[in-house]
A protein has these predicted regions:
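Short, structured motif recognition centered on aromatic/hydrophobic residues
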Residues: 1, 39-40, 95-96, 109-113, ...
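A solvent-exposed, acidic/Ser-Thr-rich amphipathic alpha-helical stretch
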Residues: 49-102, 106, 113, 123-126
Length: 153
């Protein structure tokens, strides 16, 4: 049995902006989608590890097939980068297809989901995965990834 522990969530809450702050109240679903697409481009430019270091919270969590959650910016980005490097094994860029997004009523949290795949040209084979990202709006006025879940198909 797993018992909830509020102390585990305190670091995440400390990184998140106050829902009543002006920057948060101006958030839209489109700003969340824009952050998701920017992150996808960053994976191509920086690689998965550096992209997650840039866009993840200090207490981010990454869930990948066959392993427990990687918790914390360093561990999560390292595991995420290694996973993408192993799956891709090429220099082909990843294309991201955002399927949807939801913004909480308080506008400081939301999630995006969709698919990502390697652009393999004529080849039909290659990396394909669905993703879900839980985003938190941080105190610096930026959307940051709190949770990343990848599921290859």
């Amino acid at each position: 049995d797993v018992e909830p522990n509020f102390a585990d969530t305190l670091p995440l809450i400390e990184e998140t902006a106050n829902p009543r702050s002006v920057g948060v109240m101006e958030n839209t679903v489109q700003s969340l989608i824009d952050a998701d697409e920017l992150y996808g481009r960053s994976i191509n430019f920086r690689g998965g590890q550096r992209a997650l270091l840039r866009y993840g919270l200090e207490n981010t969590r990454v869930y990948l097939p066959g392993m427990g959650p990687a918790v914390g910016a360093e561990a999560a980005s390292s595991v995420y980068g290694a996973f993408l490097d192993t799956q891709l094994a090429t220099t082909n860029p990843i294309s991201l297809n955002n399927v949807g997004a939801y913004l909480s009523q308080s506008k400081e949290m939301g999630y995006t989901y969709g698919t990502m795949q390697a652009d393999n040209g004529e080849s039909a084979e290659g990396f394909e995965a669905s993703y879900m990202r839980l985003w938190r709006f941080n105190r610096s006025g930026e959307w940051r990834i709190a949770v990343e879940v990848l599921s290859p198909f």
